[in-house]
UniProtKB/Swiss-Prot annotation:
An MF annotation (GO) of this entry: structural constituent of chromatin
SMART domains for the chain: BHL
SUPFAM superfamilies reported in the protein's UniProt record: IHF-like DNA-binding proteins
Disulfide bonds: none
Cellular component, GO, one term: cytosol
Keyword DNA-binding on entry: yes
Source taxonomy: Bacteria, Bacillati, Cyanobacteriota, Cyanophyceae, Nostocales
Family statement: Belongs to the bacterial histone-like protein family.
Keywords: DNA condensation, DNA-binding, Heterocyst
Subunit text: Homodimer.
Originating species: Nostoc sp. (strain PCC 7120 / SAG 25.82 / UTEX 2576)
GO BP term, example: heterocyst development
Entry protein name: DNA-binding protein HU
């Protein structure tokens, strides 16, 4: 499912126009990106959490020259699925 298909589904479920659904979805995504970029954690109960995590510096190799090189530490975005989301995707076995 791409963004256009998601907008269509949200518009239908919420009984709003596609333009309104697109505006709300775009605003929500931009807000999540801004919050995570500034170091905040965004938690949507039942769905999951968005946050940025520190990736440590490590040693790597240049694939062309096979020469060792230092890969610097960096921040990366991360998503952790909530319990309800995980259970919907993979129901617990009885």
């Amino acid at each position: 499912m791409n963004k256009g298909e998601l907008v269509d589904a949200v518009a239908e479920k919420a009984s709003v126009t596609k333009k309104q659904a697109d505006a709300v979805l775009t605003a929500a995504l931009e807000t999540i990106i801004e919050a995570v970029s500034s170091g905040d954690k965004v938690t949507l109960v039942g769905f999951g959490s968005f946050e940025s995590r520190e990736r440590k510096a490590r040693e790597g190799r240049n694939p062309k020259t096979n020469e060792k090189m230092e890969i610097p530490a960096t921040r990366v975005p991360a998503f952790s699925a909530g319990k309800l989301f995980r259970e919907k995707v993979a129901p617990p076995k009885a």
